[in-house]
Structures are given as C-alpha cells and as structure tokens.
C-alpha cells in the first residue's frame, strides 16, 4: 500500500528526501512511514534495529552526531513541530566528503530524510517545540559517539 517518493538530496550519494503518500478524508489521515519492500525497491534495503524519539524546545540545536564504530543509517522525521535537519558526508574517500545538505522537516509536510551510514547528523528546532523520531540501522554505542560542532570551519 505504501507509496513513497524518493528523491536523491543535495547531490550527495545515499542521502534521500522521502515523501510518503498521505490518505486524507474528513476523519483525518493515514500514511505508512516505512515499508521495507518499498524502500528496498528504491535501493534502500536497510534493516532498522532501534527507534529513538526526542522532544526539544525552539532554538535547540542537536548534533552534529555520529558514531565512529557501529555507524548508523537513520530515517528521520518530525512528528510534531518543524526542524531544520542537516546531514554531513564524513565518509573518507567519498566524492562528496565534507558536503552537507539541509532540509526543513515538519509534522505538517510529513516528509522524512534518510541519512546513510557515514554521515554526521543534527537538527535545529524552528517551532515552539518539536518531537523528532528516528529509526537507526545499528544500536547506540556511547563509546563510539562523536560530535562535530555546527560552526566547525573544516
């Protein structure tokens, strides 16, 4: 049933803006937020092993996080509010190493971003509050966690 539009984003290999099909009527709406078969057809046949959710106030900046070991691919979306989401390619040897892309994700638009393994990821809250949900391809490992400052000149 799930129909998704997958758009390579920012000219960065593996980074995808994802728009699910939303079925709306007088009662409200229904949508699939993930369907393994649809994602696999789009070349994104990853398996998610952990879901995380956060609530942040306006002006909060989270990130840019990554894990040196146990790298995580992430499918991220705002389930309330609006955020400016950023992914930075930190894959050594990548044609787009150091390149970043940002997109506004909102509960209203219901859009998502797939951030592949080997990227740093973060977001900035634009609305009064925002709830953020992300599916991960590997488990959180505090001993592997690292961060890049948002204003790092490199």
Language-model regions: role of each:
Residues 105-127:
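Conserved metal-binding segment of the jelly-roll/cupin
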Residues 1-108, 127-129, 136-154:
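Non-catalytic, conserved peripheral segments adjacent to functional cores
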